[in-house]
Amino acid sequence: MAPERLRSTILTKDGINWYYEQEGSGPDVVLIPDGLGDCQMFDKPMSIIGSSGFKVTTFDMPGMSRSSSAPPETYQDVTGQKLANYIVTVMDQLGIKTASVWGCSSGASTVLALCSGFPERVRNGMPHEVPTANPENLQNIHDADPATISRDMAAVSRAMSANEEAWDALGPEVHERLRDNYVRWAYGYPRTIPGSAATKTEDLHKVPIDWTVGAAGPTQVFFENVVIATRESIPIKTLPGFHFPYVSHPEAFAKYVVETTRKYL
């Protein structure tokens, strides 16, 4: 029988009213959402991981979806380091001392910031597709109006899912939340996230790191991830899908998280 899912909210000292979910028991695994900020994307793999002997925690990110009640500074001028500090605070309040941490995109930047800045809290890090530079179509996205951002980012995100049927199946409530999240992301993330990536040698060897990129994505988009991981002799492999493997291929994603985490227990 699948473990029960806890869904609740918690207010941390930085003023963020977090929506969070937990499932399972055992060593802690924290799944950090990508820049779109909605943890519903982890719904299917979370149960698989929780049924495999782990306690899984995830949450909507500050200012996003059901964590929208948050001070503006928590979702403006966002960096991996800023998000890492917020996540340590919520880990403290939830009693999570050490965890294996996964994150994609800005979530991956957050994973690297946790590994570098809070190695005592991280068993192992699993970054997926860390943004190190903005593609041309994001250079001036912060100048666009909210309606244009929501329309364009909905199309881009669907394409980057590499499984449009699974993306659509997230459901109308999730996509309604994402429409607002696209705007907060565009105004708060692209100008500051890429430059915050903790990719120096001194950042990358404090805890074990296993890096991934999407097998279905254009190689050039995240090729710098391959360059950095190779330079630092960090294991790097592909996962099925592109930018959201937990949506497009939930079983394969869960298997990767479980098998990778077990290496470090």
Curated annotation (Swiss-Prot):
EC number(s) from the headed UniProt entry = 3.1.1.-
The GO biological-process annotations, alphabetized, read as: response to toxic substance
Keyword annotations from UniProtKB, A to Z:
Detoxification, Hydrolase
Q: Which Gene3D superfamilies match?
A: alpha/beta hydrolase
Q: Which reaction does it catalyse?
A: zearalenone + H2O = hydrolyzed zearalenone + H(+)
User: Quick one: which residues bind zearalenone?
Assistant: 35, 105-106, 185, 189, 243
Q: Which Pfam families match?
A: Abhydrolase_1 (PF00561)
Q: Does the keyword Nucleotidyltransferase apply?
A: no
**Disulfide topology:** none
Active site at 105, 129, 243
Q: Name one GO molecular function term.
A: hydrolase activity
pH dependence of activity:
Optimum pH is 8.0.
EC top class, as a word: hydrolase
Temperature and thermostability: Optimum temperature is 35 degrees Celsius.
Regarding protein family, the annotation reads: Belongs to the AB hydrolase superfamily. Hydrolase RutD family.
Q: What does this protein do?
A: Lactonohydrolase that specifically hydrolyzes zearalenone (ZEN), an oestrogenic mycotoxin produced by numerous Fusarium specie, into a non-toxic alkylresorcinol product.
Q: How does it assemble?
A: Homodimer.
Its name, as the record gives it, is Zearalenone hydrolase
Which taxonomic lineage is given here? Eukaryota, Fungi, Dikarya, Ascomycota, Pezizomycotina
